[in-house]
Structures are given as structure tokens and as C-alpha cells.
Amino acid sequence: MKEKDIQKLIDRAIVARDKTYSPYSHFGVGAALLCEDGTIYEGCNIENASYGLTNCAERTAIFKAVSEGQTKFKALAVVADTEGPCAPCGACRQVISEFEIPRIIMANLRGDYTVVEL
């Protein structure tokens, strides 16, 4: 991916993060999923008082895309206010693997990022 495309996806994930519902952890996460056709779906984490029912930003973006008929993906960016780039949790990694998303862009609000390929 080109640098400008990576940055665009990170920027969209930052916008998504602003919509987070995280009254319990106060830890907002945003994600942006780039589909093969160029469409981008955003997602944020949505918490619940019953923590097990919380949905992560990555899964929110993926589920939105799949519910709209998308099945081919190019990359997923995830952003949080962390010291280093933010990595997906185990549940999100499982869903990322299931849908064969080839590139994960892990970023933070400081401008740091790492791209990993599956």
C-alpha cells in the first residue's frame, strides 16, 4: 500500500474513534476497513455494562461491511490513544483471520504505525 492510502485509512479510523461508546473503560478505539472495491467501512468500540457483550472497533467495521454484502478486503486500520501502535485483541484476530484481511495497520494518535501482513 502507498503511504497516502495508509494515512487515509488511519485518518478514517481516527474519525471512527470519535464515535466510541466507552463509558466504563474510557478507552476509545477506531477502525477503518478498506474493501477490494475501494469502499471504506468505519467502526468504533461499543461497550456494555456486561463486558462480554462489548464489541470492538475492528469487529464493528468488519460486521458492517459483511452485512452490506462485502466479502473481499484489502486492509484494516485500528487506532487508539496508546503508547505504541494498537494491536487487535484475540477475538478480533480470529474474525480478521476468518475474513482473510491481508493487511493490518496498527496505529496510535501520536502518528506511529506498523503494517503487518497476514
Where are these regions (language model features)?
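C-terminal binding/interaction regions
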Residues: 1-22, 68-118
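Short, well-ordered amphipathic alpha-helical segments that serve as non-catalytic structural scaffolds
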Residues: 12-15, 57-65
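Short beta-strand scaffold segments in enzyme catalytic cores
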Residues: 26-35
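Short acidic-glycine loop/turn motifs at beta-strand connectors
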Residues: 35-37, 109
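Compact, glycine-rich, soluble single-domain proteins
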Residues: 45-59
